[in-house]
């Protein structure tokens, strides 16, 4: 190998992604009832709390709290033990009218003369490592977490017996990171390292109240999760890949699962989430350029969003 390249992804239950999805859902709701809505919606999520802020100009009425709770419930935050759940979290809105000074630069008499809401730099990027022209390290990172969410919802694997019922031990928050090795011709030659961290229930009960018993239970949980990632998740992901990518997996793969040892406390309770903090995950995983603008909660008059979509069909293959 000549060099290594790494990209990461985060799940739908990661705090920053929870915030992104709430902002996007509010945007969708405004546009559904008023396609000319101007929206810039930011969200903060933390222990038991959601804060909505931003600027909106629209003729639509949107039940902000209902939309936010719907998103949180769909993601899977529906248990009080998570310290952040759809039914009981408090929601505070500070959304207000869009600035007239900004609006005058956006809305024009002729639709084709519409202005941009701001300046900015936007980049498109493509490569031939995958069928969707995305970097392989990012594509695999996304796929790992997408499949992990499927497994969580199916609750037929990565489970334990709780009160006589088979239950998934997976919780919504997770992250992945994939490192690819390249040769001197910039071609991927092997999957070097996979790091996967997933939030989980406390599904092994310590033998007693001692520190040693708790540590033994933690080790047992970690070993179970590691085995399930290796024997359940990875085979399901690899089965979805084209043959040329499958051959990049070998017995030298370094697999790190929950490397801190335990991940029960997570989601917005474990780490405050904000809209727009995963811009590299949302684009090209560190390859290509990025102007710094986020996508979520913005209507198409915001060029951070619209010009990225315009650039997608015209990306040059590298």
Residue ranges, per PLM feature:
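N-terminal, positively charged regions that mediate nucleic acid binding
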Residues: 1-40
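Residue-level detector of conserved catalytic or cofactor/ligand-binding positions
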Residues: 308-318
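Active-site pocket-shaping loop/turn-to-helix segments
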Residues: 296-307
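Conserved phosphate/anionic-ligand binding catalytic regions in large, soluble enzymes, centered on
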Residues: 10, 14-19, 115-130, 264-288, ...
């Amino acid at each position: 190998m000549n060099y290594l390249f790494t990209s990461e992804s985060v799940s739908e239950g990661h705090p920053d992604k929870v915030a992104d999805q709430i902002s996007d859902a509010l945007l969708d709701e405004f546009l559904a009832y008023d396609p000319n809505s101007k929206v810039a919606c930011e969200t903060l999520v933390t222990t038991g709390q959601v804060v909505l802020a931003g600027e909106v100009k629209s003729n639509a009425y949107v039940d902000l709290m209902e939309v936010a709770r719907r998103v949180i419930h769909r993601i899977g935050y529906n248990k009080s033990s998570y310290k952040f759940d759809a039914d009981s979290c408090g929601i505070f809105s500070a959304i207000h009218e869009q600035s007239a000074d900004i609006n005058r630069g956006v809305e024009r008499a002729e639709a084709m003369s519409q202005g941009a809401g701001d300046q900015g730099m936007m980049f498109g990027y493509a490569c031939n490592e995958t069928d969707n022209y995305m970097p392989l390290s990012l594509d695999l990172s996304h796929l790992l977490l997408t499949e992990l969410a499927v497994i969580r919802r199916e609750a037929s694997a990565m489970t334990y017996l709780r009160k006589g019922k088979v239950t998934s031990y997976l919780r919504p928050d997770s992250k992945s990171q994939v490192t690819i090795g390249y040769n001197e011709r910039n071609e991927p030659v092997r999957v070097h390292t996979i790091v996967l961290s997933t939030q989980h229930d406390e599904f092994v009960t310590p033998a007693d109240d001692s520190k040693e018993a708790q540590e033994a239970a933690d080790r047992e949980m970690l070993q179970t999760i590691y085995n399930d990632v290796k024997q359940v998740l990875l085979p399901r992901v690899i089965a979805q890949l084209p043959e040329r990518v499958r051959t990049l997996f070998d017995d030298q793969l370094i697999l790190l699962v929950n490397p801190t040892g335990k991940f029960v406390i997570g989601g917005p309770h474990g780490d405050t989430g904000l809209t727009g903090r995963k811009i590299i995950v949302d684009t090209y995983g560190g390859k290509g350029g990025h102007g710094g603008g986020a996508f979520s909660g913005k209507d198409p008059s915001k060029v951070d969003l619209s010009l990225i979509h315009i650039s997608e069909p015209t990306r040059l293959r590298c």
